[in-house]
């Protein structure tokens, strides 16, 4: 009887390698979440993208859309992006700011973005908290707060690396905008305690870092941009200020409160675009609210002058009214994004369950029921800075009034970190125009504050090249 010769050693090793490779693929990116064909594109992308759900805390399911880097995804950093609100969708960031494709006014077509942040990074867009966009909770309970959202986002991030283990060793950056000024540092404090995540830094654009500094600075911003007359300014100085210090935040003087109500009206409800002072207001001068069929449309996200009594009374009255209410960001046209994301073919491509309600840019109930536990992010940033491990960037478009540059600059100054680079212009090369001043930057030990000249609240929308240049220098630890 002739016995078969044992297989050569190299064949056994090859088989073992194939088995290991197969096993690792089984634990890698979830095939069921991969977007096979995205409607609206003339040509499908060469990079891979995924849409599905990550497990938040409790019974929460947070929708994510993950776009791999167009340049070496295996070695590119992972960047989490969160929009704010509270209660607004991060798909706004993807489809109108810095995603690989931008939705067009027809609500059908997508065009590739030459300044997409996924040119150099793997970007994870997360709709948070539950109740926002396509995110949901099995118990349908959507009242939440800063601490719960941080924990839920943290658990979702852990779930992401479970689903995509091939990225667990990549550099991780946490980024966001607006109320992500609260979301990002509170999340970062949790992430820094998890050694399995390779956290490198965080960047927040036009963030709400301190309610007090945001309100106090906004009055100065409004006056010196010609929005308040001398009579109102003089009255504010008389009734809100003493001993060369003004309190426009929680002043109890009745005349001061009356004057601040007028400032709030001018800034937020007179027809000026609160997100970009020099941009038109989409749809024309708005009223405080409007009716669309049987729905009341509200446009105040509740982040400025929150201590004014009329602001709180107005929202509570709406909640008790029993009317159907929708929230839209002021002076912003959300029709294109809403039309696109409510297209049944798009929802199917994104693996969205059929039973979920329509997608809205912002969720009124999430916003109104949200409990704001922190009035300042001072302690969170000091904890992050004390580790001396992370690079932090706070950047602001300088014509935004929702979260103005002056308030965030005051906030960074108040952290009392060692100054390393004095305030100076930073430059961007604009084709044939050569290098131009893109804004100003000052750098402290492990934290920088930077402005983008002529940009509003959504910096990548208004100044895409400057935003991309800033983002690239931030990721690569290059001088701004």
UniProtKB/Swiss-Prot annotation:
Effect the entry attributes to changing residue 178 to A: Inactivates the enzyme
Pfam families in alphabetical order: Peptidase_S10
Species lineage: Eukaryota, Metazoa, Chordata, Craniata, Vertebrata
GO MF, one example: carboxypeptidase activity
Similarity section: Belongs to the peptidase S10 family.
Residues at the catalytic site: 178, 400, 457
Protein source organism: Homo sapiens (Human)
Record EC number: 3.4.16.5
Disulfide bonds: 88-362, 240-256, 241-246, 281-331
Protein name in UniProt: Lysosomal protective protein
Positions of glycan attachment: 145, 333
